[in-house]
From Swiss-Prot:
Pathways per UniProt: One-carbon metabolism; tetrahydrofolate interconversion
The protein's name: Formate--tetrahydrofolate ligase
Record-listed E.C. numbers: 6.3.4.3
GO biological process, any: tetrahydrofolate interconversion
Classification via Gene3D superfamilies: Domain 2, N(10)-formyltetrahydrofolate synthetase, Formyltetrahydrofolate synthetase, domain 3, P-loop containing nucleotide triphosphate hydrolases
Top EC category: ligase
UniProt keyword terms in alphabetical order: ATP-binding, Ligase, Nucleotide-binding, One-carbon metabolism
UniProt binding sites for ATP: 53-60
Amino acid sequence: MKPIKEIADQLGLKDDVLYPYGHYIAKIDHRFLKSLENREDGKLILVTAVTPTPAGEGKTTTSIGLSMSLNRIGKKSIVTLREPSLGPTLGLKGGATGGGRSRVLPSDEINLHFTGDMHAVASAHNLLAAVLDSHIKHGNELKIDITRVFWKRTMDMNDRALRSIVIGLGGSANGFPREDSFIITAASEVMAVLALSENMKDLKERLGKIIVALNTDRKIVRVSDLGIQGAMAVLLKDAINPNLVQTTEGTPALIHCGPFANIAHGTNSIIATKMAMKLSEYTVTEAGFGADLGAEKFIDFVSRVGGFYPNAAVLVATVRALKYHGGADLKNIHEENLEALKEGFKNLRVHLENLRKFNLPVVVALNRFITDTEKEIAYVVKECEKLGVRVAVSEVFEKGSEGGVELAKAVTEAVKDVKPVYLYEMNDPVEKKIEILAKEIYRAGRVEFSDTAKNALKFIKKHGFDELPVIVAKTPKSISHDPSLRGAPEGYTFVVSDLFVSAGAGFVVALSGDINLMPGLPERPNALNMDVDDSGNIVGVS
């Protein structure tokens, strides 16, 4: 690894905007972005994927490798990524810093506590929860209805025992007993707010708008009513600054914020993306899960808020994912199966068609695994060419930037100045926005709203939230809301079970299917593979 000062020098960053965290990590003062406003923006490359298998398809690895490969062919590039969540790192998924020869460094530190941003978000979130219950205990001047408190508590850990709890037991000295729950920190609205805020003023305004409860008159109670947004911002004072690290080949990487891609928008901070676009020719960023979730939200929501638009999209696919969506069993996924591959290719086709609806040039990155056969690779390449889409076999995991040269060249040939196309208008009612997304992206035949969802729609209209963008929270395991429907389901009924407003983040969340905001640990969590020796060397994290 290079000292972080050398990485900063590549970007022209002076010491007065750099806050080092040891030798290899630094934060960049978020106010530095304003000094760059007269610079021309570089190209923005959005990396997304087909519907993933449980193991993931290498989207982060591809993003890192593509950025390194762009630098290799003489194009100045920065990769921007979300911060890993500690819970999944210790649980089933493992770390989120790429893999093989395409990683961000120092991987262990990034995957674990990093610069403390997750802790800051959790602290701000839980401060609000504590102040809310304290207000109720000490007279409840705002007349908060304890049966209509929406704000949960948070922890950056997978712990299913905390999904449903009772607080305030043990007598009046401990407050009022009521049901509560914990969510993982990445699902906190504070995380979404931090990722969307462009400066401290914006951050405090967004925090103040967060809805925490209803009072006994059925009126909304916000953070600003409790007067705690200033203290929450104090706890987030350093977390608003993007984190600078490097890849395995010394390419600069900005890693900042980590909102979930189902309950929120699933990409790194707007500050990091805009800063990278000012400092490089090509910014490579990724959106969580498949293109039906992350990419749609990036374009319909994040791009609108940030004032930018991708110049191209990279659709990451793997032979194993396509075989899985063609009916192959995960136990036999590494065996050649052209029939399953042919059937599963329909999943790639749907995601490609969806991306093209946004007027985006698309490059398919076929992330090669050692078990892929030549026949399987050739089939995917041939079918992509039939669809008129550029395709490049990517081997950045095994070969680093050398394995992504073909992909980098395809991306530079594909990029163009794109006229933004959004699927819905902001003045469309929420119900119509959901129907557009369900039919255009998820390929549903019709949309059904539960009675709970219908009541939520009335609340949304009554309180003036109908013109907010929509974030659909559904399973990432299928294009539909049903995780058992692999491949390219269509014509089904898309069921909306409930809706709620994230007023600070500025969107309405539509829930479809079972959405769990506090993951649990598997039978054998990744934590069992971790250890540290007497010299402080960590094993088993990434």
